[in-house]
């Protein structure tokens, strides 16, 4: 048994049993992948995969248990390497943060600047994606941590911590009839074409829920994953925008007005997500603490251990 065999099994599951893709990802041949997996099965004395001819179609019952152990073993192996690097050089290394456009564009810049000032030798990578993509990057070990409002708390192998809460706001062009109107209602907003986020992005579910509970039917004419795109089309007069309040900057968005709508939409909570059992370098904890000062390394590390 060797780690390469374990990686082949893990990657076969990740690639939906497509051995061609496994070979491409791990830079080897398909026949080599098949042989290594079969050698491991022979050594263990069980079939890990269900086969139809030469094709893998799923995991056997013992294969499911083996796969869970392999994931654990490979995570522990990576943790060992991280522990060694932690003591070899505590202030340098790599840190991958998976997050959404909204967080990367509006919530993280000051934190990232502070972090790079404190840890100039750490190579930081921001990988943007949908909340579901962020979760997969965490689970696959492609990201050290993820930051998102949606999805992360739906995965049992991801431990999440609340960072901060925020509300949506409505933005309209200057001179719009809604500007200056007091005690704005969702029924009044629904009288105009609406531009807002795609489903599963930036608290869209809270927007839909608010209109449903008010008995109002919004005319959503355009959706996007990016608040900058939403604001651009609002400025063009195509509708009014519903965006995260943090996305409105009166100094930059000079052609727009943000309306007082905090009372209309439920607060959303942005969370940081970490894979259960993962070992984090000290500087990763510092980044989390800079982003959410109420969190601390001892609390986070303790919950990561308890979750295993």
Swiss-Prot record:
One Gene Ontology biological process: cysteine biosynthetic process
Annotated CDD domains: PBP2_CysB_like
Keyword DNA-binding carried by entry: yes
Keyword Transcription regulation part of the UniProt annotation: yes
HTH lysR-type domain mapped to chain residues: 1-59
DNA-binding region per Swiss-Prot/TrEMBL record: 19-38
PROSITE patterns: HTH_LYSR (PS50931)
Any GO MF annotation of the entry: DNA-binding transcription factor activity
SUPFAM superfamilies given in the database record: Periplasmic binding protein-like II, Winged helix' DNA-binding domain
Family: Belongs to the LysR transcriptional regulatory family.
Cited function: Transcriptional regulator that is essential for the utilization of a number of organic sulfur sources of either environmental or human origin. Required for aliphatic sulfonate utilization. Binds to DNA at target promoter regions. Targets include the ssuDBC operon, the tauABC operon, three tauD-type genes and atsA.
Protein name, as recorded: HTH-type transcriptional regulator SsuR
Organism: Burkholderia cenocepacia (strain ATCC BAA-245 / DSM 16553 / LMG 16656 / NCTC 13227 / J2315 / CF5610) (Burkholderia cepacia (strain J2315))
Organism classification: Bacteria, Pseudomonadati, Pseudomonadota, Betaproteobacteria, Burkholderiales
